[in-house]
Amino acid sequence: MSIFDRLKNVAEKTAKDAARSVGNTIGTKRETFTFSALPESLAEMQALPEAKLDTPFATAALTVLALCAYAADRATGTEMLNWLRGPRPLNGQDISFLNDRFRDGKTYLPFTYFAGSTPDNNYTPAQPYKVTIESNHVSAEEQGYMKLFIPCGGADSPRPIKLRQRGSDGKWFLWEQYLLTGVRTP
């Protein structure tokens, strides 16, 4: 094994140990975010305190709001999602996926993540709007990424969302979301 390979192995081990350490620090955590109203424009979203994008939990909560906006108005929702994705905007495949998920009147899907939203009440959330974001022991396994979970009123288990931290300023951006999968029909 060359000197370069040994140094590379040490660096990789150090990075993995650091990621595990962050994961152990994060552990199982729950954060609930409360919104008096849903933003109807990117400017309104950016005016929210969570818009600093300084925690993966805040970015995950804003993603739910952006998906609600997308259900109401695709252009506004796309603008919000692109902002949350940072330097990696939605591509044609992403937009096609979103459009497919909201087809056939399934605009209720993102509302299933708010407290009080159940199939019995047609996924009408309680107000103010509250969304809870959770982490667990595997959330920080991958360095620079955080996999969080959002409880859903229409499913038995929380749904995952993956966020990426930008190294230059520490901001958290949406990387992948699995929030628009099937739920119990209202």
Residue ranges, per PLM feature:
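Surface-exposed, charged secondary-structure patches
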Residues: 96-153
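Glycine- and small hydrophobic-rich membrane-insertion segments that are intrinsically disordered
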Residues: 2-32
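Short beta-strand edge/turn micro-motifs at domain boundaries
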Residues: 151-186
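Core segments of small alpha/beta cavity-forming domains
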Residues: 24-115
